[in-house]
């Protein structure tokens, strides 16, 4: 069953974000975690208590460097257990200045360890593919290393991180995703996330050819303060999937 979510706008009042989701048919929100902190402006601590009491589903999207797996992995697990979550996203990132030929192999080991840790608590782990901006977990070969080492890890495919439809198909051939980040982009731009229809991605081609019969989570990463941009993005994808 397809579930529709969206990345929370952490500069807005949280109750307003929840109400926006309920009015417009979003099933859950994505909340970011970075440097040991759940990201939300003007929210008192502990934030996880407020998210729990709001009684609206969220999924945590953690930005981790290879060092962060050991530094923050246990804290992330603590939060997931408190929220009674059964899924989490880790988006591996690395400053190119701090990366070398061994960095990808370190990521493979870190991912395997944390997937096993979370699995022991009944938590499914998604790892996100990168754009060429990061040069880490970006190529199909990178992803193959990850999933060969840790078959229990699931793929979160960020559509806006592809270089071409061929790149997309090669990733899908490695592992079919069970979760998607959706936004638009121009192929000439290294890293870009736009409302659907503001770039040049052909989502009919993507869903009817490369992701045919997709049945999982769809998270809209539409960086806009304009509600209509988010609503219309969802409507475009629903029309492709359900008409």
Describe every region a protein language model picked out.
Residues 37-49, 97-111:
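Active-site-adjacent beta->alpha loops and helix N-cap segments on the catalytic face
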Residues 1-81, 243:
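N-terminal pre-domain/capping segments
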Residues 7-11, 32-36, 61-65, 93-95, ...:
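Active-site beta-loop-alpha junctions enriched in small/polar residues
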Residues 1-3, 15-22, 69, 77-86, ...:
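Histidine-acidic metal/acid-base catalytic patches
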Residues 26, 57, 124, 154, ...:
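Hydrophobic "anchor" residues on beta-strands that sit immediately upstream
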Residues 83-101, 126-131:
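Active-site groove signature of glycoside hydrolases
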Residues 46-61, 110-118, 146-150, 203-211:
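Alpha-helix-loop-beta-strand connector modules within alpha/beta enzyme cores
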Residues 105-132, 228, 234-239:
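Catalytic cores of phosphodiester-bond-cleaving enzymes
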